[in-house]
């Protein structure tokens, strides 16, 4: 038994979609979450800067005595995950491979779409992972840079959000049967995305998919939390306004949480 928390990092609030699924599947595990909303989005930034920011988040989580770090951010996974994983002596998990694997299982026509930040799409990481495992699958990637600002400003239900999603996804409509939400912010726009793509298109939440891998690693390294502990204390940190973060988090997690401000 290991009661240390699991650390989550993201460029902002998007990683809460992963946390929500972890709380549902593994309610006995403690969580420490750091969202760098003050510098979001990461997607348009240079690789060097993304790597620097990611390491700052990682080092913060290490001060919290975490037993595992989850990159709840596709952009950080694409740019820095391999380097961080090689440098640390605790498990470090990204969200890309679980999402890619789920897309392979989902598609029936071999036509998969991937939406993400400009950096995630430019890295071509999803296509590489998918076609490494299933070379016959055709992957269409599309950058959606306007999605993260919508979520970070808590405008997910606005009319402008609907227009932006509709306009952004137009190149993929009718061309795929599976769509990977290759940014953990995007599930917060899921109802609009599903409406635009149509009911026949399966949406893959890369963050939610990675929770299964978290469970596997906890078992493999024998670092599961206390199964008998009914109430666990989670800690949430943001580099931006805690009130905005708290508002979005409370809606998504369906519970009131305390959010602390941190300067990196």
Swiss-Prot record:
What GO biological process terms are annotated to this protein in UniProt? cell wall organization; peptidoglycan biosynthetic process; regulation of cell shape
Q: Which residues bind substrate?
A: 10-11, 42-43, 74-75, 184-185
Q: Which reaction does it catalyse?
A: L-glutamate = D-glutamate
Q: In which pathway does it act?
A: Cell wall biogenesis; peptidoglycan biosynthesis
Q: Could you tell me the EC number(s) of this protein?
A: 5.1.1.3
Record-linked InterPro entries: Asp/Glu/hydantoin_racemase (IPR015942), Asp/Glu_race (IPR001920), Asp/Glu_racemase_AS_2 (IPR033134), Glu_race (IPR004391)
Alphabetical list of PROSITE patterns matching this protein: ASP_GLU_RACEMASE_2
Q: Name one GO molecular function term.
A: glutamate racemase activity
Q: Could you say which enzyme class this protein belongs to?
A: isomerase
Q: Which sites are catalytic?
A: 73 (proton donor/acceptor), 183 (proton donor/acceptor)
Oligomer status and interactors: Homodimer.
The UniProt family comment states: Belongs to the aspartate/glutamate racemases family.
Q: What does this protein do?
A: Provides the (R)-glutamate required for cell wall biosynthesis.
Name the chain's protein. Glutamate racemase
Please report the organism this UniProt entry assigns to the protein. Streptococcus pyogenes serotype M1
């Amino acid at each position: 038994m290991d009661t240390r928390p699991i650390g989550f990092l993201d460029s902002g609030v998007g990683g809460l979609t992963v946390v929500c699924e972890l709380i549902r599947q593994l309610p006995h595990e403690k969580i420490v979450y750091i969202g760098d909303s003050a510098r979001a989005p990461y997607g348009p930034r240079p690789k060097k800067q993304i790597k620097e920011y990611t390491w700052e988040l990682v080092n913060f989580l290490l001060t919290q005595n975490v037993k595992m770090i989850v990159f709840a951010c596709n952009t950080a996974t694409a740019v820095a995950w391999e380097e961080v994983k090689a440098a640390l002596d605790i498990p470090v998990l990204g969200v890309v491979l679980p999402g890619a694997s789920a897309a392979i299982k989902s598609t029936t026509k071999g036509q998969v779409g991937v939406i993400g930040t400009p950096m995630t799409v430019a890295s071509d990481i999803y296509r590489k992972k998918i076609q490494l495992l299933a070379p016959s699958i055709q992957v269409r990637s599309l950058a959606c840079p306007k999605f993260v600002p919508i979520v970070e400003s808590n405008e997910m239900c606005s009319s402008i959000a609907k227009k932006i999603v509709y306009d952004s996804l137009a190149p993929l409509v009718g061309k795929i049967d599976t769509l990977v939400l290759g940014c953990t912010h995007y599930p917060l726009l899921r109802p609009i995305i599903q409406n635009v793509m149509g009911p026949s298109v399966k949406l893959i939440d890369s963050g939610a998919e990675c929770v299964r891998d978290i469970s596997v690693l906890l078992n493999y390294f024998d670092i599961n939390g206390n199964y008998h502990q009914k109430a666990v204390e989670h800690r949430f940190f943001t580099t931006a306004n805690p009130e905005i973060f708290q508002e979005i988090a409370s809606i998504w997690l369906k519970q009131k949480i305390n959010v602390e401000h941190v300067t990196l």
